[in-house]
Amino acid sequence: MSENNEFQSVTESTTAPTTSNPYGPNPADYLSNVKNFQLIDSTLREGEQFANAFFDTEKKIEIARALDDFGVDYIELTSPVASEQSRKDCEAICKLGLKAKILTHIRCHMDDARVAVETGVDGVDVVIGTSKFLRQYSHGKDMNYIAKSAVEVIEFVKSKGIEIRFSSEDSFRSDLVDLLNIYKTVDKIGVNRVGIADTVGCANPRQVYELIRTLKSVVSCDIECHFHNDTGCAIANAYTALEGGARLIDVSVLGIGERNGITPLGGLMARMIVAAPDYVRSKYKLHKIRDIENLVADAVEVNIPFNNPITGFCAFTHKAGIHAKAILANPSTYEILDPHDFGMKRYIHFANRLTGWNAIKSRVDQLNLNLTDDQIKEVTAKIKKLGDVRPLNIDDVDSIIKDFHAELSTPLLKPVNKGTDDDNIDISNGHVSKKAKVTK
């Protein structure tokens, strides 16, 4: 203290430091829409192109209602010129009064546009191939023809008071100058958004980011992105597109679509809740993902993949002893996703030779038995020994524990643990099976 007995000033800040989400958007990405994105669900358009898919009218309506309840912003439907029933289904879904806007996906052709605007849709998604592959082997038109057709269709759809998106097809194998010229042309006449499509799944995140940033410099409208998953980059590409400034992402339930599909709805939600938790939790009913995936899986006769983000049957299961110990102390040690956000539970898989004594101790507590730590370590060794010989199940482990306990002179029971609301880890291991369908 100074001689004049004055108080010294406090130089350090007394306010709590502001912490940023380390898994969120990079602050340098000033165009990022990671916290302001929209979803266009294409299960009833792209998903219909999945090899196993056949959705009758009733099933389409059921899926559309489920997606609307989940909170998607748009629902995209098969072109009404694809078949007579496709047109009728489009009209039927438009009459449901859903909160989500209804889109249909058409070729860049006036014949398609005239039919589309009569169905009652809120918007029309127009697409035409721009790569040399598609111009030569698909529609056979040059860029001048594409630009002229695009302007004609866009102006017609706009005259009907309907949203319009123009997208190139096979964007990442198209000439960049051609792409930017066509996008500038359609932006000038007032499209609601332009679309980038990785039609063959060839793009990587760095290419996506660079193209989106370049496109943002030449158009003022929103950017929509459609990523196929042929090389396994669909989720990463979608996230990177949002970082670069795209706003809308095409998804489908379980990623179903042409070949091995597109960005999956559930998988993207897993990525986005880590990056923008408040936005995602407030906008989407995440606990509905499991039901929607089961609905679509049943409709197309597939199982939920075991390694599916969120709903794979092992998504929140912990097996190794080191992992189990840490999870029992603090789930964040080995989980970036909270299963409760999705209406799921976490499990400790203790019936195996990799188990640790902390997991067995938790099981002993559940069985209301009284063992010391040293005794638990001893019984754990017995469990691991049998686990070296054959696969174990919960009954095997419980029998070993109970037999061990019966041989001791300690009290048979300890006071019953009534539990608390914080008991959120199930170590029963009962859900682990070879069945890949997630059930409640």
From Swiss-Prot:
InterPro entries: 2-IPM_HCS-like (IPR050073), AIPM/Hcit_synth_CS (IPR002034), Aldolase_TIM (IPR013785), DRE_TIM_HCS_fun_bact (IPR048253), Homocitrate_synth (IPR011872), LeuA/HCS_post-cat (IPR054691), PYR_CT (IPR000891). HAMAP family: Homocitr_synth_fung_arch. It catalyses: acetyl-CoA + 2-oxoglutarate + H2O = (2R)-homocitrate + CoA + H(+). Residues 1-23 have a biased composition (Polar residues). Catalyzes the aldol-type condensation of 2-oxoglutarate with acetyl-CoA to yield homocitrate. Carries out the first step of the alpha-aminoadipate (AAA) lysine biosynthesis pathway. Pathway: Amino-acid biosynthesis; L-lysine biosynthesis via AAA pathway; L-alpha-aminoadipate from 2-oxoglutarate: step 1/5. One of its GO terms (biological process) is lysine biosynthetic process via aminoadipic acid. Residues 1-27 are annotated as: Disordered. The gene is LYS21. Keywords: Amino-acid biosynthesis, Lysine biosynthesis, Magnesium, Manganese, Metal-binding, Mitochondrion, Phosphoprotein, Transferase, Transit peptide. This is Homocitrate synthase, mitochondrial.
